[in-house]
């Protein structure tokens, strides 16, 4: 191959790779504090979404005189995430390393990526919220990517990719008039709220340890 042709090919290859290299470099230049701020904002939004949806579902479909029995039913009292070893109190949380807490948070987020696509389909009135199932999914997906980026920065400086959890929660049932469906959805929403609370708590702990001046909130 002629020298000129070889040079042209190398130049073309470099131009094709430039956007990727710029993006990879951009992640490295973003201050760690900003990465944490963004992840914490998304974690808080996900937690608030879980709280609001749980309360709305409870007020809409669960009779007050049956709330206790619903909450203590075996189908609603056990969460899939209970099979993931997670700290159960602040003392246990403090004993976990930053990467351990981020990995647990990533597991929890990934277990909800598919179910959250059907989160709002439970409600007969889909106008209960201003956003859509797609927005909910992208919120968790963005949080997943943010946690992966933090793991890479804290571990070796590179962004981690690829899901590490294959098993997830089941989908929400759209049959709001069926007792079993109500029980299933109520249990799923209980678990969603519980898991998002853990994610926000774990991320706050890692941020406090990693970013100076971020513990006083």
UniProtKB/Swiss-Prot annotation:
SUPFAM superfamilies: 4-helical cytokines
Keyword Disulfide bond: yes
Cysteine pairs bridged by disulfides in the record: 79-191, 208-215
Domain of life the protein comes from: Eukaryota
Positions contributing to Zn(2+) binding: 44, 200
Comment field (misc): CSH2 sequence only differs from CSH1 sequence in 1 aa.
Keywords of this entry: Disulfide bond, Hormone, Metal-binding, Secreted, Signal, Zinc
Signal peptide coordinates: 1-26
Gene of this entry: CSH2
Protein name, as recorded: Chorionic somatomammotropin hormone 2
The keyword Manganese is annotated on this UniProt entry: no
Native source species: Homo sapiens
GO molecular function, one term: metal ion binding
Cellular component aspect of the GO annotation: endoplasmic reticulum; extracellular space; vesicle
Subcellular location: Secreted
UniProt record similarity statement: Belongs to the somatotropin/prolactin family.
Stored PANTHER family: CHORIONIC SOMATOMAMMOTROPIN HORMONE 1-RELATED, SOMATOTROPIN,PROLACTIN
Subunit structure, as described in the record: Can be found in a monomeric as well as dimeric form.
Function: Produced only during pregnancy and is involved in stimulating lactation, fetal growth and metabolism. Does not interact with GHR but only activates PRLR through zinc-induced dimerization.
PROSITE patterns per UniProt: SOMATOTROPIN_1, SOMATOTROPIN_2
UniProt record, GO biological process: animal organ development; growth hormone receptor signaling pathway; positive regulation of receptor signaling pathway via JAK-STAT; response to nutrient levels
């Amino acid at each position: 191959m002629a020298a000129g042709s070889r040079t042209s090919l190398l130049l073309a290859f470099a131009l094709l790779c430039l956007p990727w290299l710029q993006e990879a470099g951009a992640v490295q230049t973003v201050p760690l504090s900003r990465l944490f701020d963004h992840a914490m904002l998304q974690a808080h939004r996900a937690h608030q979404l879980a709280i609001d949806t749980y309360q709305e579902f409870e007020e809409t479909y669960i009779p007050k005189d049956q709330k206790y029995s619903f909450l203590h039913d075996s189908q609603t009292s056990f969460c899939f995430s209970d099979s993931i070893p997670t700290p159960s109190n602040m003392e246990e949380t403090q004993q976990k390393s930053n990467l351990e807490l981020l990995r647990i948070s990533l597991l929890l987020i990934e277990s909800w990526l598919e179910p959250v696509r059907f989160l709002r389909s439970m409600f007969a009135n889909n106008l209960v919220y201003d956003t859509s199932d797609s927005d909910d999914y992208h919120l968790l997906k963005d949080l997943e990517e943010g946690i992966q980026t933090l793991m890479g920065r804290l571990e070796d400086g590179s962004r981690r990719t690829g899901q590490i959890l294959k098993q997830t929660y089941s989908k929400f049932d759209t049959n709001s008039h069926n007792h079993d469906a109500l029980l299933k959805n109520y249990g799923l929403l209980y678990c969603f709220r519980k898991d998002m609370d853990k994610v926000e708590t774990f991320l706050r702990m890692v941020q406090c340890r990693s970013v100076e001046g971020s513990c006083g909130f």
